[in-house]
């Protein structure tokens, strides 16, 4: 589901709200979440999961075109950990041998 699809579905489900208001709400929520993560804060949405930053240490990578070794610096990357309710909901829907992709 894309952001546009999410906005469209929410606008249909919440018919009393204008589509522009739903669009603004979703974009504001995502902007606030991005800002919190950028500030190093953890975001927890009970029943859904939590977003945090994980540190990736410096490492040696390769340029795929030339095969040349390249030193990659350490960095922080966003990480999502699903909550128990979300894990249970997803595991009950998909059979174990199904490929979600």
Swiss-Prot record:
SMART domains for the chain: BHL
Positions of region (Disordered): 62-84
Presence of keyword DNA-binding: yes
Keyword set includes DNA-binding: yes
Gene3D superfamilies reported for this sequence: IHF-like DNA-binding proteins
GO molecular function: DNA binding; structural constituent of chromatin
GO cellular component: chromosome; cytosol
PROSITE patterns assigned to the protein according to its UniProt record, in alphabetical order: HISTONE_LIKE
GO biological process: DNA recombination; regulation of DNA-templated transcription; regulation of translation
Self-association state and partner proteins as the record states: Heterodimer of an alpha and a beta chain.
Family from the record: Belongs to the bacterial histone-like protein family.
Entry-linked HAMAP family: IHF_beta (MF_00381)
Function in brief: This protein is one of the two subunits of integration host factor, a specific DNA-binding protein that functions in genetic recombination as well as in transcriptional and translational control.
Full protein name: Integration host factor subunit beta
Lineage: Bacteria, Pseudomonadati, Pseudomonadota, Gammaproteobacteria, Lysobacterales
